[in-house]
């Protein structure tokens, strides 16, 4: 009874951390909307997150799990579905044509695969145990893919020595969410919840370490950019004062 109470408490904390994780890209997409461009941001993590949320929402429902034993899992992933759909929609709206096509080529198979998973688990397996194994195994692979996708951003950080496209809060909440859900899964002896988070934890730690290493380089680059802009403004202003007119555009 006590262990179940602790598990529920950890699940609630996991829900809170996951909510922050799913909501963290809001800052990124505010920037996308403001600039009217997706810049170098990738949509792959959001598509993989959508697939993961679909699977674990289904996993937590009474169709797969026994009763509402995993209600916290289905509730937070249900919210995740709504947020990921919103992010993917915004990304698609502001993305160039080729990236729009790429998003569609990824999203449609994801939705089709989830539909097949739901149908097969409902009609081919007749016990909760078998359904959990089937859906959980697919969810395990999806979670590993989701937690591995930020490694693309990590590689970019190492290459460019800039954390511009790897937001700090996304890395922090990813680590906290993974740690809490790993504990939740272990307390309930549910390896399909605990296992993927064994991978998510070190991935989150790695991102935080990279952020600590390269954040100074990013700040210094921003300062140099500001100084260059300021110096450019001073040169133009001085030219105007001396000549009494704006500088002519450079000829080809």
UniProtKB/Swiss-Prot annotation:
Mediates both low-affinity uptake and efflux of sugar across the plasma membrane. It is found in: Cell membrane. Keywords: Cell membrane, Glycoprotein, Membrane, Repeat, Sugar transport, Transmembrane, Transmembrane helix, Transport. Glycans are attached at residue 70. It comes from Oryza sativa subsp. japonica (Rice). Residues 30-43, 97-105, 154-167, 212-252 are cytoplasmic. One of its GO terms (biological process) is carbohydrate transport. This is Bidirectional sugar transporter SWEET3b. Its main location: membrane. Residues 10-98, 134-219 form the MtN3/slv domain. Coiled coil: none annotated. Belongs to the SWEET sugar transporter family. Residues 1-8, 65-75, 127-132, 189-190 are extracellular. InterPro entries: SWEET (IPR047664), SWEET_rpt (IPR004316). One of its GO terms (cellular component) is membrane. The chain crosses the membrane at residues 9-29, 44-64, 76-96, 106-126, 133-153, 168-188, 191-211. GO terms for molecular function: sugar transmembrane transporter activity. Forms homooligomers and/or heterooligomers. It is a multi-pass membrane protein.
